Amino acid sequence: MDKKKRILVKFSGEALAGDSGFGIDSTILKFIANEIKSLVDMGVEVGIVIGGGNIIRGVSAAAGGIIKRTSGDHMGMLATVINAIAMREALEFYDVDVRVQSAIKMEAICETFIIGRAKRHLEKGRVVIFAAGTGNPFFTTDTAATLRAIEIESDMIIKATKVNGVYDKDPNKFEEAVLLNSLTYDEALKDNIKVMDDTAIALAKDNHLPIVVCNMFKSGNLCKIADDDLSFCSIVK
């Protein structure tokens, strides 16, 4: 690795749930914590954003017509705080110095997000987990992750998924799906290419933030990316 990198890693809440589809699987939590620890041990400055879909999604909560979408999204933000606390505990278990910063004030649980403070934590080698999305309804955690990556001047954002990268079609449905090692932001915005939501991609494009998509369940992938090996994944730039 030529220089010290600053990377933001985004993964979904569903990833924490494992096969059960709900809640937090301690085995997966330990695995992710170890992968993040390996990055820290390389000298990489690491930020994290976790979704909340393993607990609740704002859109789903509002689908019944009783809960307003804004309230549903606030519930989703709280779910990301739950996941952030779990990840903090897992990282601390492995002696990683970590802070949680929330877009919504909740001082009894974690810090409130302040850009300068987040950067200082990163410079001191602490992992920073950004929770509660952007703090606003109608914005996804993908958009929140992209925003935080730009704010902390990250070199890239890694979207850690269950597949090896971006495909020209859904690899779970089509055996002939082809992995795209490199694509432009405009190509990523096409309807059949699912990288992130359009707002997140447009934000990354406007700020020249590379998006790397990889399989989070293959040990060592994050470290390879930090060491500039992108042969096994996809990059949007």
UniProtKB/Swiss-Prot annotation:
Binding site for ATP: K10, F11, S12, G13, G53, R57, T161, Y167, D170
Leader peptide range in chain numbering: none
GO annotation, biological process: 'de novo' CTP biosynthetic process; UDP biosynthetic process
GO terms for MF: ATP binding; UMP kinase activity
Keywords: Allosteric enzyme, ATP-binding, Cytoplasm, Kinase, Nucleotide-binding, Pyrimidine biosynthesis, Transferase
Main location: cytoplasm
NCBIfam families with a match to the protein in the record: pyrH_bact
Catalytic activity: UMP + ATP = UDP + ADP
Enzyme Commission numbers on file: 2.7.4.22
CDD domains tied to this protein: AAK_UMPK-PyrH-Ec (cd04254)
Residue spans crossing the bilayer: none
Family of the protein in this entry: Belongs to the UMP kinase family.
Gene name in the database record: pyrH
Any one Gene Ontology cellular component term annotated for this protein: cytosol
Notes on how activity is controlled: Allosterically activated by GTP. Inhibited by UTP.
Keyword Disulfide bond: no
Residues that hold UMP according to the record: G52, D73, T134, G135, N136, P137, F138, F139, T140, T141
Ranges for region Involved in allosteric activation by GTP: 18-23
Pathway this chain belongs to: Pyrimidine metabolism; CTP biosynthesis via de novo pathway; UDP from UMP (UMPK route): step 1/1
Subcellular location: Cytoplasm
Described purpose of this protein according to its UniProt entry: Catalyzes the reversible phosphorylation of UMP to UDP.
Protein name per the record: Uridylate kinase
Subunit description: Homohexamer.
